[in-house]
UniProtKB/Swiss-Prot annotation:
A Pfam family that the UniProt record links to this protein: Ribosomal_S7
Disulfide bond entries: none
Record organism: Gunnera chilensis (Chilean rhubarb)
GO cellular component, one term: small ribosomal subunit
Keyword Ion transport included in the entry's annotation: no
Any one GO biological process: translation
Gene: rps7
Protein name: Small ribosomal subunit protein uS7c
Amino acid sequence: MSRRGTAEEKTAKSDPIYRNRLVNMLVNRILKHGKKSLAYQIIYRAMKKIQQKTETNPLSVLRQAIRGVTPDIAVKARRVGGSTHQVPIEIGSTQGKALAIRWLLGASRKRPGRNMAFKLSSELVDAAKGSGDAIRKKEETHRMAEANXAFAHFR
């Protein structure tokens, strides 16, 4: 048994303008080469575009998009005997949000468009409506987990 203490789970800080943890998580994931001010700029421009497109609170659109993309279950490769099985595992809320943010950013990076703020705003609006690549990724993950429900006992 380890004598070391368990690490405290860090809570995400909130951003200066919206005072929201989700926005800060998004900023930290979009961050490249330590340029945090640029990441904030991209997020705030995307939020402004969401405000213009939907004429609703951009924070509620962001929450709805992340709630829509957050997976309940995922598959994890597990080697049993000589073969590798895709074992379905349940995902906690924090990990689910992190996955959702990663999928949203990945889908927006793949989108054709002028700049990242435009692409991110479009992806967030689509995800809030229930369409888009990030939603497709979640559904695909759920299908994989459902198909491999027979290997659930390998957990």
